[in-house]
C-alpha cells in the first residue's frame, strides 16, 4: 500500500471546520517547497524578462480572504450576493488602470495575457478570419498566430518578420502582407522584440486595409506607464497586457480600449465567453499594483530598467557576444551565442548552476531547434526592482561571460563554486523584502 500523501495536519483531522494551522504546520511538503523557492529568489540573479518582484502589499492582497469570494459578472451586475466589497476593489482596479494609461474602458478580469488575447479574438473575430502578427521566430508570441496555438488553429494566421540584417521589423514587408491578405486583425507586440514599435505606422497600415489594430503590450506595459516607451492607446483599437513583467503586479491580464462598442464585446467575451468567476484576490492585487505604478517613483523605476538593460546588453556585446538588432530600447535583449559556439540550452543550464536565471531564446531565423536555440533572452526588470544599477549589471554581464567561457573551455565544474560565491555576494547587498 502506498504511503499517504495527505499533509500531516490533515491525516487525522476532524471532518468539519476550517483548519486554522499555519502552512508549515498544516502542510510541510508545500511549505518546504515554498521556502526553498524563497531562498532561490533571494540568492539568485533574476534575468528572465517576463519576471519581476512584487511588493509585500501585492503579496498580501493575493493572500487575502478575497480568495473565498465568488463574483461572476461585473461590479453592480453580479450573479451572486455579498459582492459589495469586491465590487469596490474591482472598481478601484478599473479606475486606476484607466488613469495609468489614459484609456476609457478597461477589463481587469482576464486570468492571463493569453486569455486577454483570446477575449479579443472571441469578441472581434470569427473562426477562419485572417490575423497578421509578428512571427514567433522573429520575437513574436504564441498567441499571435503560431500553428501550435489556438490562434493559429482557429484563424488564418499570416506572419510578418524582421529584416535579416538589422533584425528590425520589416514594415514594408508587413504592409505588403497586409495588402495581399487583408487581415481582419493586425497585431503589434511580441515576447522577444527589443526595439520600439512604430504604432503610428501600424495604425496607418491597419486603416489602409480595413483591419482592427490590436497592441499586445504585455512586455512593455510598465515602461509605457513609466513614460519611457510610446503609448499605444492613441493608436490601437484594443490593447491587451499582462499585469506582471514590467508592470510589477500579480500574474494576470487586462484589456483596454477607447471604443464603447468594443468594450461591450470584450466584457461579454471575458464573461461569460471565456471565464466564469473572476479571481477577486488577484484583482485586488492588480489594484494595488496599479496604484503603485501611479506613484511618481515608478517613472524613476521604468527609466532605470531601460538604462540597466542597455548597460547589460552593451557589456555583453563588448565581451564578444552578439546582440540582435545591436541593442535594446526596453527591458529585454536577445543575445546571440554563436560567437562562443554555445547553445541557448547549455547556457541556460550553466548559468542557473551558478545562480543566474534566464531563458534560452531563438534568435531571428534561428538554425537550431526551439528547445535548443542559438540565443538567450536577458531582462532587467526584476534586478532593477531589487535596486541593481548600471555597475551591478556590468558585474552581471562579466559573470555571464566568465561562465560561458568556462563552459567553452570545459572548466565550469572547477570554476562553478567561485562564480556562485560572487553571485551570492552581489545579491546580498540588495535583499528582497520577503
UniProtKB/Swiss-Prot annotation:
It catalyses: (6R)-5,10-methylene-5,6,7,8-tetrahydrofolate + glycine + H2O = (6S)-5,6,7,8-tetrahydrofolate + L-serine. Its main location: cytoplasm. Signal peptide: none annotated. GO terms for molecular function: glycine hydroxymethyltransferase activity; pyridoxal phosphate binding. It is an enzyme of class 2 (transferase). The record marks 244 as: Plays an important role in substrate specificity. Its cofactor is pyridoxal 5'-phosphate. The modification N6-(pyridoxal phosphate)lysine is found at residue 245. It is found in: Cytoplasm. GO terms for biological process: glycine biosynthetic process from serine; tetrahydrofolate interconversion. Pathway: One-carbon metabolism; tetrahydrofolate interconversion; Amino-acid biosynthesis; glycine biosynthesis; glycine from L-serine: step 1/1. (6S)-5,6,7,8-tetrahydrofolate binds at residues 136, 140-142. NCBIfam families: PRK00011.1. Catalyzes the reversible interconversion of serine and glycine with tetrahydrofolate (THF) serving as the one-carbon carrier. This reaction serves as the major source of one-carbon groups required for the biosynthesis of purines, thymidylate, methionine, and other important biomolecules. Also exhibits THF-independent aldolase activity toward beta-hydroxyamino acids, producing glycine and aldehydes, via a retro-aldol mechanism. PANTHER family: SERINE HYDROXYMETHYLTRANSFERASE, SERINE HYDROXYMETHYLTRANSFERASE 1. This is Serine hydroxymethyltransferase 1. It comes from Rhodospirillum rubrum (strain ATCC 11170 / ATH 1.1.1 / DSM 467 / LMG 4362 / NCIMB 8255 / S1).
Amino acid at each position: 500500500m502506498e504511503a499517504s500523501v495527505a499533509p500531516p495536519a490533515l491525516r487525522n483531522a476532524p471532518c468539519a471546520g476550517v483548519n486554522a494551522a499555519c502552512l508549515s504546520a498544516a502542510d510541510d511538503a508545500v511549505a518546504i517547497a515554498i521556502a526553498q523557492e524563497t531562498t532561490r529568489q533571494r540568492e539568485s540573479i533574476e534575468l528572465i524578462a517576463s519576471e519581476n518582484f512584487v511588493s509585500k502589499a501585492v503579496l498580501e492582497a493575493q493572500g487575502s480572504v478575497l480568495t473565498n469570494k465568488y463574483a461572476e459578472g461585473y461590479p453592480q451586475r453580479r450573479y451572486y450576493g455579498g459582492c459589495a466589497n469586491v465590487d469596490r476593489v474591482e472598481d478601484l482596479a478599473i479606475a486606476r488602470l484607466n488613469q495609468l494609461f489614459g484609456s476609457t474602458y478597461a477589463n481587469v478580469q482576464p486570468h492571463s495575457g493569453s486569455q486577454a488575447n483570446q477575449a479579443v479574438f472571441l469578441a472581434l473575430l470569427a473562426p477562419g478570419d485572417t490575423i497578421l502578427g509578428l512571427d514567433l521566430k522573429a520575437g513574436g508570441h504564441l498567441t499571435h498566430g503560431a500553428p501550435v496555438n489556438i490562434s493559429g488553429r482557429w484563424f488564418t494566421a499570416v506572419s510578418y518578420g524582421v529584416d535579416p540584417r538589422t533584425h528590425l521589423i520589416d514594415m514594408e514587408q508587413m504592409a505588403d502582407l497586409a495588402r495581399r491578405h487583408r487581415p481582419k486583425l493586425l497585431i503589434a507586440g511580441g515576447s522577444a522584440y527589443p526595439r520600439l514599435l512604430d504604432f503610428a505606422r501600424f495604425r496607418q497600415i491597419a486603416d489602409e486595409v480595413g483591419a482592427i489594430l490590436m497592441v499586445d503590450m504585455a512586455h512593455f506595459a510598465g515602461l509605457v506607464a513609466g513614460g519611457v516607451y510610446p503609448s499605444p492607446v492613441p493608436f490601437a483599437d484594443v490593447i491587451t497586457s499582462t499585469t506582471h513583467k514590467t508592470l510589477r503586479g500579480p500574474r494576470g491580464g487586462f484589456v483596454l480600449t477607447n471604443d464603447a462598442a468594443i468594450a461591450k464585446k470584450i466584457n461579454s467575451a471575458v464573461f461569460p465567453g471565456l471565464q466564469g468567476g473572476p479571481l477577486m484576490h488577484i484583482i485586488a492585487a492588480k489594484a494595488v499594483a496599479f496604484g503603485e505604478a501611479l506613484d511618481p517613483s515608478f517613472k524613476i523605476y521604468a527609466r532605470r530598467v531601460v538604462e540597466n538593460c542597455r548597460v547589460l546588453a552593451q557589456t555583453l556585446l563588448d565581451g564578444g557576444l552578439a546582440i540582435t538588432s545591436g541593442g535594446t530600447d526596453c527591458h529585454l535583449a536577445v543575445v546571440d551565442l554563436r560567437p562562443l559556439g554555445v547553445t541557448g540550452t547549455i547556457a541556460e543550464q550553466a548559468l542557473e548552476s551558478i545562480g543566474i536565471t534566464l531563458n534560452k531564446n531563438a534568435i531571428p531565423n534561428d538554425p537550431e531547434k526551439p528547445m535548443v536555440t542559438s540565443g538567450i533572452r536577458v531582462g532587467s526588470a526584476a534586478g532593477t526592482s531589487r535596486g541593481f544599477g548600471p555597475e551591478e549589471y556590468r558585474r552581471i554581464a562579466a559573470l555571464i561571460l566568465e561562465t560561458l567561457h568556462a563552459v567553452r573551455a570545459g572548466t565550469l565544474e572547477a570554476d562553478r563554486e567561485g562564480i556562485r560565491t560572487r553571485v551570492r555576494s552581489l545579491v546580498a547587498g540588495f535583499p528582497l523584502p520577503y
